[in-house]
Amino acid sequence: MAESSSNPTRINILGKDNIIIDHGIWLNFVAQDLLQNIKSSTYILITDTNLYATYVPSFQSVFEKAAPQDVRLLTYAIPPGEYSKGRDTKAEIEDWMLSHQCTRDTVIIALGGGVIGDMIGYVAATFMRGVRFVQVPTTLLAMVDSSIGGKTAIDVPMGKNLIGAFWQPERIYIDLTFLNTLPVREFINGMAEVIKTAAIWDESEFTTLEENAKAILEAVRSKNKSADRLAPIRDILKRIVLGSARVKAEVVSSDEREGGLRNLLNFGHSIGHAYEAILTPQVLHGEAVAIGMVKEAELARFLGVLKPSAVARLTKCIASYDLPTSLQDKRIVKLTAGKECPVDVLLQKMAVDKKNEGRKKKIVLLSAIGKTYEPKASVVEDRAIRIVLTPCIRVHAGVPKDLKVSVTPPGSKSISNRALTLAALGEGTTRIYNLLHSDDTQVMLNAVAQLQGASFSWEDSDVLVVKGNGGRLQATSTPLYLGNAGTASRFLTSVVALCNPTDVNSTVLTGNARMKQRPIGALVDALRANGVGVKYLEKEHSLPVQVDAAGGLAGGVMELAATISSQYVSSLLMAAPYAREPVTLRLVGGKPISQPYIDMTIAMMASFGVQVQRSAEDPNTYHIPQGTYKNPETYIVESDASSATYPLAVAAITGTTCTVPNIGSKSLQGDARFAIEVLRPMGCTVEQTDASTTVTGPPVGTLKAIPHVDMEPMTDAFLTASVLAAVASGTTQITGIANQRVKECNRIKAMKDELAKFGVTCNELEDGIEVTGIPYTELKNPTEGIYCYDDHRVAMSFGVLSTISPHPVLILERECTGKTWPGWWDTMSNYFKSHLEGEEEPHSSHVSHEKPRKGNPKSIFIIGMRGAGKSTAGKWMSEVLNRPLIDLDHELERREGQTIPEIIRSERGWEGFRKAELDLLEDVIKNNPTGHIFSCGGGIVESEAARKLLISYSQNGGIVLLVHRDTDQVVEYLMRDKTRPAYSENIREVYYRRKPWFEECSNFRYYSPHPDGSKALTEPPFDFSQFLSVICGHSNHLEEAKKKPQSSFVSLTVPNVSKALDIIPKVVVGSDAVELRVDLLEDYDPEFVAKQVALLRSAARIPIVYTVRTVSQGGKFPDDDYALALKLYRTGLQAGVEYLDLEMTMPDEVIEAVTNEKGYTHIIASHHDPKATLSWKNGGWIQYYNKALQHGDVVKLVGVARELSDNFALARFKASLAAAHDKPFIGLNMGTAGKLSRVLNGFLTPVSHPALPSKAAPGQLSAAEIRQALALIGELEPRSFYLFGKPISASRSPALHNALFRDNGLPHQYSLFETDNAADVKELIRATDFGGASVTIPLKLDIMPLLDEVSDAAKVIGAVNTIIPVGSGDKVTLRGDNTDWMGMVYALRNAGVVKVSKESPAAGMVVGSGGTTRAAVYALHDLGFAPIYVVARNADRIKALAESFPADYDIRSLSTPEEVAAESTAQPSVVISTIPADKPIEQSMREVLVASLRHPSVTNGKHVLLEMAYTPRHTPLMQLAEDAHWQTIPGLEVLAAQGWYQFQLWTGITPIYTDAQAAVMGN
C-alpha cells in the first residue's frame, strides 16, 4: 500500500481535529497515532472476512513492532454484508471480547465499510457502558458518510438502524488508497452520498462532480490491475472526499444529536431508506438513496419549491455516475428480479423514520442545487408523497372559476434537440437558456458526450453551457441507447455518420421495444445512397442500426422521401455542412410532411452561421453549403408550442384564462397557430402578440365543434384538439395528421380507443380522425383507467379532459410526461389547483396492450440434411401445434409450375433454382411471420443470403429448428432411397460441409433417438412433444412444481445414457425431473451430448435438468474451460431442456450469454461450497443468493453440514429470504449431517435411486426415503383411500395401491368399503384425511351428485370410477374422473396399437352395451377409430348408446353375419369386449363375432382383442379370437392400468407399470 508523502489533512469535528485524510496512512501513521494519542492496554481490530487477509496481517506486523510489550492487539473477523449487522453478531462479538478479558480501557478499531462502522461503533457504545473506538472506513460510502458523526446502530426486522446510539469515534482515519481495491459497484454506490452532500450544501462542489464524472468513472472502470489504478484521479478523489467529509463534519458540529440541521444529511434517505428496506440486500444503500434523491427532488418540484431544471440537473448528475434514477432502471429490475415496492408498504416504512414528528413525515426538500428549502427536514403530507411514488395519477375535476394564470411551458423539444445538435457540431461556446430538461434531451446530451462531440456544464442551475468541438466526433464501441426518444434517434443517425473511426469503425444506435418498431427506413436509404454504410441489426427499417464512421457524408445530390417524418429532412440538413462537397437535398415522393419543422431547422441553422438556400425552381429542393457552425454566445429556446396547447386547452375547457408568455405569432413552431386556428373557432377568446398568447374559454360545456380543420402544420396538437372536440357540440373532423400513426404509438387509434372509454365516438380517417362530442356531464367513467402507450402527449391530453370529467379519472403511466414536460402534473396542481391523487396500477389495466401471450406464435422453419427426418418432424409438429405445414420444395414447385429437377435441367440451372428458393424463403418470412411451419430443402444453407435470412430470423425471436439423427443412419437411408435426385458428391462429405451452416442458422436442434421405421414414427413421439412444449413456451412445469409441497429431481450419474436405458424408467419414478450430469459423461463433444439429451428425454419422459458441474463446485468439469462450458450450455439450450443449472462462479460474459439465449428454458442459478467455507449462520451466502436471484428462475445454494444445527441455520436463512422474494429456492447441505436439509427442502430436491451406480452428492437420499422421513416427522400426513361398490371382496385394488404406496415411501392406506348406497360414503369423502377413492358398480353414476366437479371424459362416458381431492385445508374440491378408458388405451398401446391417422382410417368394435361399454367407445374414439361397431343383444340399447354420443363417433350396430359382410371395406382391427365371461356368449352375438374375427380382410396387419372381464383369466371370447389369429389382452391388464392411472392422479407419482401389473397379477 502506498504511503503518504506529506502530512495528512485534518478536519475539525465537534472542536477536535479528529478526521484525518490522505493517501496511504493505514500502515505507519495509524498505528503510531493510536499508540501515542489513544493509549490502551488492549486494541481490538475488527473487520470482515473479505478484508482480513488483505489488510490485517500487515497492520499487525507494523503495530507489534511499534507497541510496548504490555500492549496487545486482538483481531476478529465477521462475514461481510448487511446480514451481519444484527443482534446475533453484536452478541457474538461481545461474548468474544469478554472471553478475552477486555476491560473499559479497550480501544476498538472498526476497519471496513458502513456495516462494520455502524455495528462496531454500537458495540463500543454499549460494551461496559462505553469504550473508545476509531473508524477506519474502507469504502467511499463510509468515508464520506457513515464513519463521520457518531451514529452507530444495528438493523432489526422492522427496519435499518433502529436500535443504536450516538457514540463519537476518537479518530476517523480516511485512507484513500483503500479505494484502489474497492469493486466498481461499491465505489459508484459511495458516489451517491458525495452527490447528496453537494446537492444540499455546495453548488460549486456539485459542479465539480458534474465536470469530473467521465474521468472518475473511466478510472474506476479501468482494467488496470496495478495497485494504484485510481492514480489518474488522485487529486480529484481527495478533493471530493474532503469536500463531502467537511460538509458532514460542519453539520454534525452544529447539531450533533439531530435537532434539525443534521436532518439535512438525510436528503434522499426518507424515500431511499424505504426502497432499501424492501429491496435489501440486492440493492445497495447508495443505489437506493440515488433513487430516493430523484424522488425527493420531484416531490420538491411538485410542491412548487424547486425548479424543474434543478431536478433535471440532479438526475443527470446521478445518472452520469451510473447510479440508478428510478426503480425501472434495468439493473435494479435485474438485481431484484422485478420485485415491486407497493406505495402503502413504502409509506409504512417511511413512518418509522427517526426524523418524523409523531405521524407527520419529514423530508428534506431542495430549493436549488446546493440549497435546501428549510434548514431542516420539512413536514410533507402523505398525499403528495404518494403522487411521486406511484405510477398512476387520479385527476379530480374542480379548476376554480375566474382563475387567471400565466404558465411557462418547458423549452421546445424540437428546438432543444436541434439546438443541442447544432451546438455540439459547432465551434466555440454557447449558453442555452430554457432548454427542455426531459428524457429526450437527456438522451441527446448523453449521446453527444459519448461521441466526444461537445462538453457540457451548468450555470445558475438552468443555463446549459456547451463547448462544441466543431463536428469532430469519435465513433464509440458502446451502443447509444436512446430509449423511446424518436427525435434524438433520427438526428443522431445522420450525426454518427460524421464520426471518425477510433478503435471501432462504426457506432450502434438502439432503443427500447417501442423504438425498435418506429420507422427510420427512408433516412437510412438516403444515407446509403450517399455512400454511408448502415446495417439493420434486427428488424428492417427500424433501430437498432450500425452506422459506419464515414467522417461525413459524400455530398452532392441527395434524395429523400419526406412524407413520413420531417425529422429525416432536418437530420440530413444539419449534417450536410460537414459533407465532402456541398449538398443539394431533394425531397421526393409527394408533399413533405410538417413543413414548418423544416423551416424551423433552416432558421436555426442560420442562427448558428450556416445559410440554407431553398431552390427558386423547386420549393422541395435545398442547397446546403459546406461549412462549420459558429456557436452564438447565447441561444434562448422557445417554450414548446405543442406543450403550450395543454394549459391553453385547460383554460378553454374550464372557462378560465391562461397566458403563455413566450409563444406568440412570431414563433418558429407550427403549433403556435393552435390558439388562433383551433381554440378561437371553438368559441374561445384569443389574444396573441408577437411573443405571447392568452386564451379565455367560453362557459363550461359550450365549446363548439369545428366541421373540418387541417392540422398538418401542427400535427402533434391534434390530440389536444381531440379531447376538446369530445365535449364540444357537434362533430369535429381533423385531417393532415397521417404521420401521427408512427409516433410514440399510433396516436389516432389511441385517441379513438381511449375516448371510447368516456363514451365518445370517433372514426379513424385515412389521414385523420372524426370526433363526435357529447355533453361533458354525460362523460362515462373510464373505470380501467386511461392507458397512455408510453406517450407523453396522450397522458397530457387526457389530463386536460379530466379537469371537467364528472368522475375522477385514473391516468396510467403518469411519468411518461417526462419526455417533454416532467412537471406537467405539478403545473396542474400548483397553477390550475387540480386535486390529484397517486395510485398503484390496477392489475387489470390494459392487459391486452402489455401482456405477451404464453408461448411463441412465430412461424417455425425446419432445416437439416435430406433424409434427417424434416418431413416427419414437420408432420408431428403440425399435429401437436395445430398449425399448417408447408414443404417449401413442394411450394416452390407449385408456384413455379415445374418440378425441382425440371428447373435444374432448364437454362436456369442450379443458380436459378437457388435464386427461386431464396425468393420463396424471403417471401414466407415476410408474409407468414406467425402460425406456420415451413420445412426447408436440405440445400437451403448453400446460399449465403438464405443463411443470413435464417440467422436474422432466429435472432429476432423466430424458431429455426435443425432436425438430425444418427449420421450413419441418414447416409444408409439415402443410399437406399432412389426417389430423390442423386448427390453429385459423397453424401457424408455434403453433410460435413453443411454441418457448420446448419448450426449457425438454427437456434434449436432436435436429435431424433428413434431408429428408422420404429413404431413411434407413425405419430408424434412423447419426447418430441415434450421438446416442442419447451421451445414454443407451452411448458408450465416450473409453475406446477412451485404449487407442490414436495418435488424432486433424480441425479443421473452415468457416463453414457445409452448404456443405462434399462434402468432409467425405474430411477425416475417419483421424481418430477431428471438431472443429466453432463460433467460425468464420457465425452464432451456437443453432438454426443445432444444425443444423450435425446436418449434421456425419450427414456425418462419427464423434464430434464441439464448440469455441467465444475471441479471446484463438486463436479468433474474443468474449472477454467469457459469456452467449452459455454458451448455445452448452448447445446442444452438448443436441445430445449426444461432446466439448465448455471454456476454463478462462471465469468459474467458466460452468464450473460446463457441468460440472454435461454428462450423458455428455466435457469437454475447455483453455487456449491463443497469445502464448507461459508456458513448459513451469518451473511456469507448472501452475495451468492443475490447473484443467483439476478440471473436465475430458480436459486440453488448447496453448503456442507458438519452438525445437525447447520440444517436449522439453513432453514432460518431460507425463511428470511422467502419473506422477501417468492423465487423458488433449493437450499441444501451436503454430507451425512445434512440429510435433514434434503428432507425439509421441499422444492426440486436432488435425489438419488438405489439402482444408480453412485450418488451425485454426499448425503443424497432417494425420493422414497425423503417421503418416509417426512411421514416420520409429521410433515407428510397419512391419507385414507377406499374402494366403494358391491361386491368388492375379491378386488385386487388394495394389493395394487398398498404395494405402490409402500414402494414410494408413502404412509397411506387403501381399504375396501363395501356398499351399494352412495349416501353411505358422503361423510367419508369429506373427511380431513380422505386421500381418494376408486368407485365400481353399482355406484359409478350414483356417486356423481356428491362431487364438486367431473372431468370431461367422465361426463361423456357418464360414469366416475375415481375420486380425487384437489387443494388442501378448507379449499378441497372433490373431482370425479374415469380411468377405465385410460387403462384400455394403455393396454392397447402396450400391445402395439397406434393412433389411427386420417390418411389410414380404421374401424373398432365394442361387444356389449353395459356401463363399461361407454368407456370402451370413448377409448376407441380417443385412438381415432371410426366407425365404431357395437355388438349386443338389445338393439334398443345400442340405439340409445349411439344417440348419447356425438355424431363424429360414428357408432354403428352389427347384428347379423350379413351385416358384417356388407361392411367389407371397414372391418374392425381392434375389439373391446365388455360382456361377463362367466356365462356363454349369446348365439346371435357369437355368429357376428365369428364372422368379424374371421373376415378375409383381417388377415393383414395387427388385430387385437381386449377382454375387460378378468374371471376367468382366459375367457371363451379370447379363445375365439386366438383361433382366428388375433392377439388378445386379458382383463387384468386393464385393471392394472386403470389403477396405475388412479395412483398417478392421487399422488402425482408415475410408478413403473410393471410394478402395478405385478401387484394385480399377484406376482
From Swiss-Prot:
Q: What is its EC number?
A: 4.2.3.4, 2.5.1.19, 2.7.1.71, 4.2.1.10
- Report residue spans for region: 3-dehydroquinate synthase: 1-382
On cofactor binding, the record's note says: Binds 2 Zn(2+) ions per subunit.
CDD domains per the record? Answer: DHQase_I, DHQS, EPSP_synthase, NAD_bind_Shikimate_DH, SK
Give its localization.
Cytoplasm
Region spans: Disordered: 836-857
| Annotated region described as Shikimate kinase, given as residue ranges | 857-1051
Catalytic residues of the enzyme? E258 (proton acceptor), H273 (proton acceptor), C816 (for epsp synthase activity), H1168 (proton acceptor), K1196 (schiff-base intermediate with substrate)
State the GO CC annotations.
cytoplasm
Catalytic activities: 7-phospho-2-dehydro-3-deoxy-D-arabino-heptonate = 3-dehydroquinate + phosphate; 3-dehydroquinate = 3-dehydroshikimate + H2O; shikimate + NADP(+) = 3-dehydroshikimate + NADPH + H(+); shikimate + ATP = 3-phosphoshikimate + ADP + H(+)
Q: Could you tell me which InterPro entries the record lists for this protein? A: 3-dehydroquinate_DH_AS (IPR018508), Aldolase_TIM (IPR013785), Aminoacid_DH-like_N_sf (IPR046346), DHQ_synth_AroB (IPR016037), DHQS/DOIS_N (IPR030960), DHQS_C (IPR056179), DHquinase_I (IPR001381), Enolpyruvate_Tfrase_dom (IPR001986)
By its UniProt entry, which HAMAP family does this protein fall under? EPSP_synth, Pentafunct_AroM, Shikimate_kinase
| Described function | The AROM polypeptide catalyzes 5 consecutive enzymatic reactions in prechorismate polyaromatic amino acid biosynthesis.
Official protein name in the record: Pentafunctional AROM polypeptide
Q: Which organism is it from?
A: Sordaria macrospora (strain ATCC MYA-333 / DSM 997 / K(L3346) / K-hell)
